[in-house]
Amino acid sequence: MQAKKRYLISLLTGAFLVLLIYLGGGGVPGPAAPGSRSRTHGYNRPDQPWPHFSDPLQHFSPWDHSDTEDYNVHISPRQKRDVNSSVYKGKRCRMQSCFDFSLCQRNGFKVYVYPQQKGEKISESYQNILSTIEGSRFYTSDPGQACVFVLSLDTLDRDQLSPQYVHNLKTKVQSLALWNNGRNHLIFNLYSGTWPDYTEDLGFDIGQAMLAKASISTENFRPNFDISIPLFSKEHPRTGGDRGYLKYNTIPPFRKYMLVFKGKRYLTGIGSDTRNALYHVHNAEDVVLLTTCKHGKDWQKHKDARCDKDNAEYDKYDYREMLHNSTFCLVPRGRRLGSFRFLEALQAACVPVMLSNGWELPFSEVIDWNTAAVIGDERLLLQIPSTVRSIHQDKILALRQQTQFLWEAYFSSVEKIVLTTLEIIQDRVLQQSSRSSVMWNSHPGGLFSLPQYSSYLGDLPFFYAKLGIKPSPKFTAVIHAVTPLVSQSQPILKLIVSVARSQYCAQIIVLWNCDKPLPAKQRWPATAVPIIVIEGENKVMSSRFQPYESLISDAVLSLDEDTVLSTTEVDFAFTVWQSFPERIVGYPARSHFWDNNKERWGYTSKWTNDYSMVLTGAAIYHRYYHFLYTHFLPSSLKSMVDQLANCEDILMNFLVSAVTKLPPVKVTQKKQYKETMMGQSSRASRWADPDHFAQRQTCMNKFASWFGGMPLVHSQMRLDPVLFKDQVSILRKKYREIERL
């Protein structure tokens, strides 16, 4: 009897345990997956979200079983790992392990673009990228000379629901003869993944290729291998682009609004958590965060109690007006980590407040975003208003100014985004001559600071003030000679004597671009400074701006052979240049204007109240611009100058103004600077040719087209000696001869 009771009790106990496990076993945690990462450590990192706890309780609102679309579905960690492993099989790729440096050592940093395949569609944005590369100094049409390869297959939009999606890309890429598992290849991408989770799935194995990708996460980003680029719209200009909207600084730097945002709310799904919580910090006064539920075709099926109020308030405000009148602009994540709001805020000089955990910010390898943005945390949304209010006005002003620099240097056009990407890769390849962080984050930026010239900041005129360096105490005169020496009274000989008497002259270089042989050494005047005669190889106009090794001084006095300048005028121009070492300083001024009737740019030599160019027939500038002219400008523009034997001075002014964003500096009232006795048969008489002036009009528009806009800046300033024309004794004046001219 006792045994039967024991058996019965054991049986009931076992049945009860089985029933308990069956009914409640779903809540018992199982062993961790082998590939899962512990979150015990590093819980304060902003790029890791809070742990996700599933709610076993029933929802307060009844579930509508008629909804066939599950907006809150989330793929499992295993599925996410599978997706990432299929896309990032080269997860551990770095330049040292997945890049062949030997391809770059043979021919330098050259980029090859695959020929476009017949029948393949290419989006306008991707065509802009390819056109930029093909028009850059990095491009080569010979794959045997290439260091980096770019696909002609459109990889920008890899959302399977997009009409721009290219099908069968995996097969097409693998069939490329030069693919080599993606080694030394660069892939551009703006959109990846699709509804509902928008994973970073490109739909094909990138192998060992580098990714230039928008909205890339820090989890998938391969440091010093991939490049994070900004998300830009198809309307983003290919070249040029509008300048930043900051016209002047206000002190204190506060605007009408402290913090603004206007955008979609995303009722459900990825990206909705933060945007659904914005109403908690919205006060409709200085913090205006507006969202609308009107997104997608079925938004009304998922609207909540706040939607009607949010939609009504959303329509009351103009987005552009908010953008231009706010101190800070909130940039929360969307469906993907990046959004168009980022570039819009930069251009508007509205300091971005980043609220997108885990986003690798654009060009983070070289740009210090702490100097231009506020990096927030989605989990600390309620602290954002108090955080931005605590920022001192000096810091706000510095942040605002840096947004304008970064926008104009790297983001205002597709061309700048692409060239910045290529320059970053080039710095990795040529580490011995790479740019410093100061070059990337200071005016004029990395695109205009070529490390092939020098990686030392003190060799570039833009950093003299920052480093406390004084400009060069001497100059080198470069005289462009195009007519033979037939008389000892020719203007070039008088010019050499006059320049050589300057106390600041280190040497004189005569660039012999004449068809006649070089004159004998004794034909040149005896001077206290050395005279170096260089015979141009091709005898073309662009040769006057070659970075000759003989240029030992930073300052270059550029002169035409028929220029008439006294020693006093040379001295005064040089002393003025020492105060403006990054600009062109000189005598002959010209201007540009917009012709409304012809709808084109015009060139004028009329004496007006302003000017935008100082011609290089009598001007001083830094020798670095010789290097930029030769190595930065495309061969198409230089070939045009050489064929016309004209416009080289205009092109140099375009280049310097594009770099500095400043006008040149004219000195003294002198307007005529040419020798009138030059023979009409000489090549110098081209100034009297009516076609010469017409050609310069054509050049203006050709140059403006390549620069993507008009870089020239007008000025109404002219610098004269302090006592110029003053009613004092002539003996008290330092540059007394200038008044007699």
Swiss-Prot record:
Glycosylation: residue positions: N84, N325
Cysteine disulfide partners in this protein: C647-C699
Gene Ontology BP, a term: heparan sulfate proteoglycan biosynthetic process
EC id: 2.4.1.224, 2.4.1.225
Metabolic or biological pathway: Protein modification; protein glycosylation
Membrane-spanning residues: 8-28
Binding site for Mn(2+): D562
UniProt-recorded name of the protein: Exostosin-1b
Gene: ext1b
